[in-house]
From Swiss-Prot:
One of its GO terms (molecular function) is DNA binding. InterPro entries: DNA-dir_RNA_pol_bsu_ext_1_sf, DNA-dir_RNA_pol_bsu_external_1, DNA-dir_RNA_pol_su2, DNA-dir_RNAP_su2_dom, DNA-dir_RNAP_su2_hyb_sf, RNA_pol_bsu_bac, RNA_pol_bsu_CS, RNA_pol_bsu_protrusion. This is DNA-directed RNA polymerase subunit beta. DNA-dependent RNA polymerase catalyzes the transcription of DNA into RNA using the four ribonucleoside triphosphates as substrates. PANTHER family: DNA-DIRECTED RNA POLYMERASE I SUBUNIT 2. Its EC number is 2.7.7.6. It comes from Nitrosospira multiformis (strain ATCC 25196 / NCIMB 11849 / C 71).
Amino acid sequence: MSYSFTEKKRIRKSFAKRASVLPIPFLLATQIESYAAFLQANLEPDQRAPEGLQAAFLSIFPIESHSRNARLDFVNYVLGAPPFDVKECQQRGLTYASPLRAKVRLTIMDKEASKPTVREVKEQEVYMGEIPLMTNTGSFVINGTERVIVSQLHRSPGVFFEHDRGKTHSSGKLLFSARIIPYRGSWLDFEFDPKDYLYFRVDRRRKMPITVLLKAIGYTPEQILENFFSFDSFHISRKSILFELLPERLRGDTARFDILSKSGKVIVQKDKRITVKHVREMQQAGIDRLEVPEDFLLGRVLGHNVVDKETGEILALANDEITETLLGKLRDANVEEIRTIYTNDLDQGAYISQTLKIDETADEMAAQVAIYRMMRPGEPPTEEAVKALFIGLFYAPERYDLSVVGRMKFNRRVGKTELDGPTTLSNEDIIAVIRILVELRNGRGEIDDIDHLGNRRVRSVGELAENQFRSGLVRVERAVKERLSQAESENLMPHDLINAKPVSAAVREFFGSSQLSQFMDQTNPLSEITHKRRVSALGPGGLTRERAGFEVRDVHPTHYGRVCPIETPEGPNIGLINSLALYAQTNEYGFMETPYRKVTDGLVTDEIHFLSAIEEGQYVIAQANAELDGDGRFTNDIVSCRHKNEFTLATPDRIEYMDVAPAQIVSVAASLIPFLEHDDANRALMGSNMQRQAVPCLRAEKPLVGTGIERVVAVDSGTAVKAVRGGVVDYVDASRIVVRVHDIETRAGEVGVDIYNLTKYTRSNQNTNINQRPLVKVGDVIARGDVVADGASTDKGELALGQNMLVAFMPWTGYNFEDSILISERIVANDRFTSIHIEELSVVSRDTKLGTEEITGDISNLSEAQLGRLDASGIVHIGAEVEAGDVLVGKVTPKGETQLTPEEKLLRAIFGEKASDVKDTSLRVPSGISGTVIDVQVFTREGIERDKRAQQIIDDELKRYKKDLADQMRIVEADAFVRIERLLIGKIATGGPKKLAKGATLTKEYLESIDPHHWFDIRLADEGASVQLEQIEEGLAQKRKAFDAAFEEKKKKLTQGDELPPGVQKMVKVYVAVKRRLQPGDKMAGRHGNKGVISKIVPVEDMPYMADGTPVDVVLNPLGVPSRMNVGQILETHLGWAAKGLGQKIGDMLRAGKEIVELRAFLDKIYNTSGKPEDIASLTDGEIADLAQNLQDGVPFATPVFDGATEQEIKDMLELAGLPRSGQVTLHDGRTGEAFDRPVTVGYMHVLKLHHLVDDKMHARSTGPYSLVTQQPLGGKAQFGGQRFGEMEVWALEAYGSAYTLQEMLTVKSDDVNGRTKVYESIVKGDHKIDAGMPESFNVLVKEIRSLAMDIDLERH
């Protein structure tokens, strides 16, 4: 087993019993692959598949003019290079996007020619707007902020059958219905009403009898009956009526007359029910015709039109009921045979026939007109309009599209074998659906479960973007059609025809403000990755919160391995927003799949199959925890399995598949909770959600007890920096790592250098701090994929959301009542939970009517201390410590001219005083923020002179870029010179620098004596070597040229003006870093849904301590465990203590200077006594020493979900660490020194500080803004508002009879405008009298009554 560079520095001991068959797939694959398929950017235009952008273009083009004389064809499209990279876009507030150009061909036909001939063809590239690009971490940068497009779970197109569960009609009768849902186009519903008539409706409009639709699509009543019924035949003569008998149709009926055999024996007596036995006897007796009485025929329904053979007159129509009169008429016309439809009350209802009776339309045209009137009420139905509308509804590909998925689902449901076909509806499709619906009503078949994941599919980014792009193109198509007719006469080019604005508007609208385009949750790496793996049932075309019932939100058996049953928000969105399970992926149709191991003849193989929910139902699937022997055979005779969405037991020979891993059913966040199997699901849900709110601490600390997935999450989220290629570290500082790549990994023409510029103190979307730290030293050899730098909340390449705290479960004088948390002062002193938050404050200088606002350091009425922080340009220095109210950027705005008195004019003229014309509108630090300025950015509009500060920022950036290029060049040259040295030594020269003699052999000493750049001047006798030398020289010259061009490009980008909103001349952004220490009121939590608020920070000496004097860090309430049933936290605490104890033992061994052999033996005991074995022997002595050094503060454990450490293993580890097997110890009270009565559970728990900090919530108003109409103070921290004194609070004061307090509350402290000012004046004068007046809200009430035309006045006494 090989370990990566960072893994071998700290190996996590895993308790997993089952070896992993399938590595966890790349966690952002869904997003990245979906968008790559949409763009197809790295494919040649002619190799692109018809999906994504290509499909959108092909579905709209070619566009023909109305006269068919001009046509616009699509050839291909090209995506240009984005003008700015991701970082530049974030700084400048731009969208990271690529220009899209489509090549189109305009063909104009010759009108005059007799047969169609082409007059001219023009081809041209047309700009189609910008398409946002995805960053390599699966997000988008839109207007400078990172956003995520969440995948949507929607109802799959196809056909669905359901019933109303007896809720519509009072009798509780089940009313069946069917619905054909296309990908785009009109919905078609079929439904039964309580009287068993069958109706249809289009797009939920008013219903019409189903036979109207069948007639409209071209069926006659005769054909309709033929399609849905089987017939009984009768032979009529003057004397008798013979009935062609099919005995099985009579079963269950009552005989209306004696049924006799040919010999005259009675088989069934009159009024007896015909049973299966009777039917068998009739078949044996060979009865095929029966003479029946007349009333047996009466009341039956004709299945065809009856025509008089002689006259051609229609005697009776299909679906007519046979009466005595009609029967006489038929006998008179000598009709010999008639067919009636076969129905019975049990399983052959006459629904279609009855519906045909209530249908008043006569023929196809009348039916189509009826449908037209329903769709377009009030419009006159002309024949063309009626035909066009009807064809457009279900038959025109541009208006109606079932999609490939819809056709596949449709064919599967109606029982066809082939899964592809046209994506519009056909007559056969409609007949097939009605047939199944009638069968359902007849009691045969099953309805569909719409919450089954086989009936819901995922639309990912690519598909959502494609739909938006297509909708933009449809708008373009309309405009192009209009203009094409002009193109014929006016000699227009393709770019004159196409206006790309609708396309770019649609795309911008989607990425900027769609419900599914969300501001990325960037609190920590886990919240990023979870946001990108989220699946939402909301959004356009999805559900709404209000309408979604319980069933949709509930966990469904098909969620197994596809959607996490645990992670979902609490509140109104519960169950509507889900998270993809760890191994889940989507198939080509958009249905979720999960992997299983193939089982053949009871032997579990390593062959992996991905199954969708539809396929899974038909197999017998064993759980991941089924016991296997060494060969991979099931050891038990009966194994717990899943089959047809039910849990059952099966013998090994029946099993066809087996789960891949125990963690397969949960999502990333849930799989990070150790001992998840011991937690109640509700608490696990809170735990998953709270991990996403953990604020990155100053120093990340790996969890002592993890689940082994931490490394995968840290690397896949993109926060930890991964080596792109293997090599040797050449240079490291805090902000960049330079790697000299191995020769074998460098392709021809590539630069053999990788430079990793690290992100330093950058603000995330949630104002947390993103900071990367290098993990490598100069000279380290790294391989591709190794972690070279840690990001926020990662520790040596592992996710580290919180800190490991020594916790004790015990009460402490009521300070941990109701989930409060008591913490030690030591935590605060050691900055364990200190976090850095970065606030972005910006100011713009605009061009106003009265003149331009000016950013300047020259501001009147500012103290020296305030001005001292600003530079000459009026912008704060980096590194300045600022408090609330301090000036960050000085800015003055021109004031309107006021009328001056002659005296003032005179003074002005003498002193030239102009300063009073401006008012101070500087950017100040808002209340509640104090910190250090860490960065300043200045943006200037094109054509406006830059100030010194802006210039200096640009120069620094260029210097940094130059350094990168110089490093690359240095390494490239060094590599080249090594190659040249190898080439030259030992070769014969014909001349060269330092008067090199002809025929001399080149030596290392000679080469070292001259500047390597002069080696190119050496002339060689060997022709081949000379050519090689020239090639290397040329290669270096090209590289230099490329680097110079790159530098110039960067310089041009930086020196060109910035794009700013209209009217804005300059924008300054100041970044302030705020340090937040832990304090009472902050919310903290464990990973098991155990959350609480800090109630008190206690001095270290008062905390409970162990016998050796170690004080605990956190005291938690033991009552928080039993009722919440999250026992996982207790097991984590025990195992965490063992981890720490083992680390201390290793530390003692190191300090005692023990031999490496002893260390190896002890490590072997830890790693290889139980759980997954680790290959300690493969590490060198140096690596073992390094590993032991890193394990001193605790041996990290992994206890994977559903496959974790057992109670026995935890006890063994405690014993190995020399700790009590019970995990409990007697503590002493820090205040008195006395021992507590009972042993207390003590250990290490990974505790998180959540992003609900008291600093962000605390706020106090003295005087602030008032609401305009009511003149009452505003509410909320953002508005600097007051506390609401509501109705109930008024009752409280009334109850106490405190009249004056009440009066003060409702008047001068609220909306008595005059009273407020008077109170202020009297307080200033030292007089504490209150004179309350009229509250403004009363005036508002008076005004409202007047608005109702009632004159109301106040009478003053």
